[in-house]
Curated annotation (Swiss-Prot):
Gene: tel2
GO molecular function terms noted in the UniProt entry: Hsp90 protein binding; telomeric DNA binding
Sequence segments annotated as region (Disordered): 484-503
InterPro entries, per database record: TEL2_C_sf, TEL2_Regulation, Telomere_length_regulation_dom
Localisation: Cytoplasm
Keyword Glycoprotein part of the UniProt annotation: no
Keyword field contains Cell cycle: yes
Phosphoserine, modified sites: 490
Protein name per the record: DNA replication checkpoint protein tel2
Length: 868
């Protein structure tokens, strides 16, 4: 090694350099000699012989030499030194080292590095373990990405057109995950457990999707190495990996909760077989205990129950009963009804209904006689919420059926709520007979779907054109001389490139619209599809079930659409189509769009698009005045779109003015004194009545709570710990959307109003705890306070939400006194404080009493504190 180092320090020819580099492929173990070799390579050889070509043999040999722990760390240290100096004269060296580090990262062989360290003869066992831990920590802590990103940002050597994989977090995770999957797939690897720490680091990274995707093929076959690695993980890592794997399948196999098809049964059975190849029933029991509140579709819930309940071991049956006991303990707790959202309660109820047929009758009989079960059913029957009472009735009926308590006279609640479609669907879950099916069904499913679509297209009968017989005697004109046509018409020739030979027709069916939108290679199809999307949706909503059958697919396609061709008014056409789809199929598209907002990996633009469409749809449900105006009463098209097209900012600003104006008028009268006496003509009663607007039915209030509002609140509470959902830009649109939904809904009395108000207050309380410094976020909070104070009565707020109301008032005072929030926030907070005083002037004592009730029992001395 010393001779190599001295030889590299002198001028050297390329053939001799190649021979030396081939001998230096395994010098990754730290030692003084190896360190000197790397110093000569990085200082002399790399700046001289690196050319950055793809097929260069010297570049490849250098990258292989530096693809060890020592080489990678030296490159990162050299880049960090350049960043600290920030000398632009070193830009050429920085570019060379960046390219070398990128290629060395691609050449990393985890198996070779493992053998290099663990089979070393110069290291002790303790040194081997320490060096391997350092190598895994170096890769899992993203040191390469951090050093490359800092160098690229400082010297600006690469733009977006040429991106290095190792500098991108997602690409870095994807490459390492692919290398890890390649190692695990090798049957010769005897100890895959040594990679469990790297698995842990990548599993807790910021991009789980990039980590999971390369590992999915391993789960589709029986892999002993994956099982060994999975067993060496901690329980929390096991559950996190399984949950993310199921979420990927959740997006791949969507379903409709309203009805179960034979396709769902086949997918459930084959997917359960696929997942049980490498994971035991105990893993899925733990997964349900950990993540029963995660919003997944019915297929995934059925798969989890099948994988966790079908087993021939007595120990697994005991574990199943323990898991059901723990789930029933949560379900029967009185705090569960008050603390968890309705979506989470329904999710746990579905799991229990799916588990009941898998349990023995003796266990269910003992459960039905227990005090825990009796208290749970009685608490739900006493609830004022229809859905909660329905859950209790269904659970009582199903358990009485399967426990054999009343075979001759089964329990049945003959009430209207049990005759609804949702109640029938929930009750039918206990009669599902899921079982393991062959895995090949998953591969055949896409083929079946494609062939069914092709059959539908071929079955469309094309009407033949009517044959019109012409009588030559009638149309013959002997006295008319025909014109002479030229032999060649240059304007109509087929060789004219300006003539469009195939015209793209407007879509007639919803399925055709989806196909045209998905065709990302045709500019004309994208343009025609977007221009006609809203018209086709409105036309199809008037008759038939075609739109409802394909509403989910059309919604997903519209949201994921990108402006690849720079179409004019692309955003407006996309938003108009989504809004029209929400207006016509809110019961189908509402839950899908709200769930995907928090579950799917959407960009910030797509999240803002979803929230804006929800707000516009809510405002259009009860506002159709614009459609009744004659064209003469409207501005020209472009001016009308500019000044009157609704956006979420315009809607929220209009509502703010509507809510704040009465308060400001009262303050102005109080400050300036009473106005002089004004007189006006007293009109006839008939004239007054004729000018009043006609009352309109609030169509939004019939669907908003279960289709939009509750899903938005519960989804945020479950995902509020993720960084993407506490960014100021998202919070601004989210708060304004909730405020618009709340205000537009409560123009008439609706059922479940208290539940909506409670969940709205919980979300605002969670956002207030963030203490955002962004004025726009605080403006959204104040807008929400205005909506709550305007809609709800003072007694209801003080009695139900006294503690939260006083907290909101204190937070508003903090914003009013803060010098960094701006004039708009200060004026809004002043109006909110006045409304707080008006609402709580008579009920402040009641709010304080409720606040004291939450902390400790009332004693006579504390009534004095409350001002009683």
């Amino acid at each position: 090694m010393k001779s190599f180092a001295s030889e590299l320090s002198k001028p050297i020819q390329k053939p001799r350099l190649k021979e030396i580099l081939k001998e230096l492929q395994h010098i990754g173990v730290p030692s003084p000699c190896n360190l000197r070799l790397y110093h000569e390579l990085i200082s002399v050889i790399v700046p001289t012989f690196w050319n950055g070509k793809i097929n260069s043999e010297i570049d490849f040999l250098l990258a292989k030499c530096f693809s060890t722990l020592l080489g990678l760390k030296l490159l990162c240290v050299r880049l960090d030194n350049f960043v600290q100096e920030a000398n632009l004269q070193n830009i050429h060296l920085v570019t060379v080292y960046l390219e070398l580090l990128e290629k060395a990262f691609e050449c990393i062989d985890l198996d070779d590095n493992c053998k290099l360290i663990w089979e070393s003869t110069v290291l002790s066992d303790h040194q081997k373990q320490s060096l391997w831990t350092e190598f895994i920590f170096f890769l899992g802590n993203f040191k390469i990405t951090n050093s490359m990103s800092a160098a690229m940002l400082t010297f600006k050597v690469y733009d977006d057109s040429k991106r290095l994989k190792a500098s991108s977090m997602a690409d870095y995770i994807g490459v390492l995950s692919s290398k890890l999957a390649c190692i695990i797939s090798k049957p010769a690897v005897k100890t895959p457990e040594i990679y469990s720490k790297l698995f842990h680091y990548l599993l807790h990274s910021s991009n789980l999707k990039a980590f999971i995707n390369p590992l999915i093929p391993l789960t589709q076959k029986f892999c002993v190495q994956l099982q060994k690695l999975f067993a060496d993980l901690t329980v929390s890592d096991q559950m996190l990996f399984l949950n993310q794997l199921l979420l990927e399948h959740n997006t791949k196999y969507p379903t409709n909760f309203s009805y179960s098809t034979a396709r769902d049964d086949r997918i459930t059975g084959s997917l359960a077989t696929l997942l049980r190849l490498n994971f035991s029933s105990t893993h899925f029991l733990r997964l349900i205990e950990f993540y029963w509140g995660v919003p997944t579709n019915l297929i995934i819930k059925r798969v989890e129950v099948v994988c966790s309940s079908i087993s021939y071991k007595e120990s697994d049956k005991k574990e199943l009963e323990k898991t059901v006991d723990s789930l029933f303990n949560i379900w029967s707790n009185a705090q569960f009804l008050r603390s968890y959202t309705l979506l989470a309660q329904e999710s746990l109820t579905i799991y229990l209904l799916l588990f009941i047929p898998k349990l023995e009758a003796k266990y269910l009989n003992n459960l039905s006689k227990s005090l825990m079960f009796s208290n749970a059913i009685s608490c739900r029957l006493d609830s004022l919420d229809d859905d909660i009472r329905m859950h209790g009735m269904i659970m009582a009926e199903v358990i009485s059926t399967y426990s054999g308590v009343s075979l001759s006279n089964p329990l049945a609640f003959d009430v209207p709520i049990m005759k609804t479609t949702k109640a029938k669907v929930l009750k039918s879950l206990s009669s599902l007979k899921d079982e393991f099916l062959p895995i090949e069904i998953l591969n055949d499913e896409s083929v079946i779907a494609e062939t069914s679509i092709e059959k539908e297209e071929t079955n469309v009968t094309h009407l033949e054109k009517p044959v019109i017989s012409k009588n030559d005697d009638l149309i013959r004109g002997d006295d008319l001389e025909p014109y002479d046509f030229p032999d060649i018409d240059s304007e109509d020739t087929d060789d004219d490139p300006t003539v469009s030979r195939s015209k793209t027709h407007s879509p007639v069916y919803v399925q055709d619209l989806c196909k045209m939108l998905k065709d990302t290679e045709s500019f004309e199809k994208q343009r025609v599809a977007l221009e006609n999307a809203s018209k086709l949706i409105k036309r199809k909503s008037a008759f038939g079930t075609e739109l409802r059958d394909h509403a989910d697919e059309l919604l997903q396609t519209l949201i994921s659409l990108q402006n690849r061709f720079d179409l004019m008014n692309f955003d407006e056409m996309q938003m108009t189509a989504i809004v029209e789809l929400l207006l016509t199929c809110l019961d189908i598209c509402g839950p899908v769009i709200c769930t995907n907002l928090f579950v799917s990996d959407y960009s910030m633009r797509q999240k803002i698009l979803i929230l804006s469409c929800i707000s516009l749809a809510a405002s259009k449900f009860n506002d159709d005045d614009n459609e009744r105006l004659f064209p003469s009463q409207l501005l020209p098209g472009n001016l009308h779109d500019q000044f009157y097209s609704p956006t979420i900012e315009k809607i929220s600003d209009e509502l703010e003015r509507k809510l704040v104006f009465p308060v400001m008028s009262e303050c102005k009268d109080y400050a300036e004194g009473p106005k002089f006496l004004q007189t006006r003509y007293i009109s006839k009663q008939s004239e007054i009545e004729s000018k009043k607007p006609l009352p309109k039915a609030n169509r939004l209030s019939l669907k908003v709570d279960k289709s939009l509002f509750l899903l938005l609140t519960s989804g945020y509470m479950l995902a509020s710990r993720k960084t993407a959902f506490i960014e100021p830009l998202f919070l601004v649109y989210y708060l304004k959307t909730l405020g618009i939904l709340f205000f537009e809904t409560f123009t008439s009395k609706i059922e479940g109003a208290n539940r909506m108000l409670r969940e709205y207050v919980d979300v605002l309380n969670e956002v207030c705890r963030l203490r955002s410094d962004t004025p726009e976020v605080n403006e959204g909070l104040l807008f929400s306070f205005l909506a709550i104070l305007e809609i709800s009565s003072g007694r209801t707020l003080a009695n139900e939400f006294g503690k939260h109301l006083l907290f909101f008032e204190a937070y508003t005072k903090f914003l009013f006194e803060s010098p960094d929030q701006g004039e708009k926030v200060k004026s809004l907070s002043a109006a909110v404080l006045i409304l707080f005083e008006n609402k709580l002037s008579e009920f402040r004592t009641l709010a304080l009493e409720k606040l004291l009730d939450d902390s400790a029992p009332l004693v006579p001395e504390r009534f004095g504190l409350a001002g009683l």
